[in-house]
Curated annotation (Swiss-Prot):
HAMAP family: FixB
Species whose genome carries this gene: Escherichia coli (strain SMS-3-5 / SECEC)
GO biological process: carnitine metabolic process; fatty acid beta-oxidation using acyl-CoA dehydrogenase
UniProt-recorded name of the protein: Protein FixB
Family matches, as Gene3D superfamilies: HUPs, TPP-binding domain
InterPro entries: DHS-like_NAD/FAD-binding_dom (IPR029035), ETF_a/b_N (IPR014730), ETF_a/FixB (IPR001308), ETF_asu_C (IPR014731), ETF_asu_C_CS (IPR018206), FixB (IPR023461), Rossmann-like_a/b/a_fold (IPR014729)
Residues holding FAD: 255-283
Pathway the protein acts in: Amine and polyamine metabolism; carnitine metabolism
Function: Required for anaerobic carnitine reduction. May bring reductant to CaiA.
Keyword vocabulary terms for this entry: Electron transport, FAD, Flavoprotein, Transport
Amino acid sequence: MNTFSQVWVFSDTPSRLPELMNGAQALANQINTFVLNDADGAQAIQLGANHVWKLSGKPDERMIEDYAGVMADTIRQHGADGLVLLPNTRRGKLLAAKLGYRLKAAVSNDASTVSVQDGKATVKHMVYGGLAIGEERIATPYAVLTISSGTFDAAQPDASRTGETHTVEWQAPAVAITRTATQARQSNSVDLDKARLVVSVGRGIGSKENIALAEQLCKAIGAELACSRPVAENEKWMEHERYVGISNLMLKPELYLAVGISGQIQHMVGANASQTIFAINKDKNAPIFQYADYGIVGDAVKILPALTAALAR
């Protein structure tokens, strides 16, 4: 048996749902999708869900992860085994841990390849900071996986598809984190997974203010703006959702223009599938040039305005 009887899918990020659904179609006979609203439910059916389970009734101050209890109960009620697919977002990994505990299931994060043999999942993902690929065969009846972006192609919606919709009512967990305040995200929504052209900045850009130079280039060529992990996590110059690398975005654009990025393996794992890599770095010995199809050795702060002017013509 090279498929599971059932797969359960949930994505806190709508843009990641199509690829998870495509993976679900390849890995199981019946697809169940947890959703948060009717619009997501309709989308899930068009993407191939046989059953949609609408999570309902959560108080505003509670976190989405607090649905883990009723999600696990629903999964157990409909089969003694199964596969759970989640995106490798922060929330996806938090939910994976909670579901793994409740289902007594093995959890594997950042999966880049998933296959099924004899009813058991085999998962490959990067280990040792991207220096090697580890393979795990999951022996527990339930398997909970968080999937790296780009692992599966996006499923295409089909408006003629039909499916059944059910409601899963909120049940307060015995122990939970309560949200006491929220802060609106300052950036516009970003969908880097689908971008044809990506301009990505590293700490070599020099300062947060200099990122505006990369933004101007993006406007000139119709590209999306991304960054390296240090820019997002250490310097806090850009949002977490934009960083490319082993533990976040894995991109496959037509062009990846790396600006001031050294090219460490942990970053390049997320960019090396690009059709063309163009690097700008003032260090001629930077590892990025080993991956680049084209490169310019020089100061990005001086090069970007000239490049933008030339490409905007």
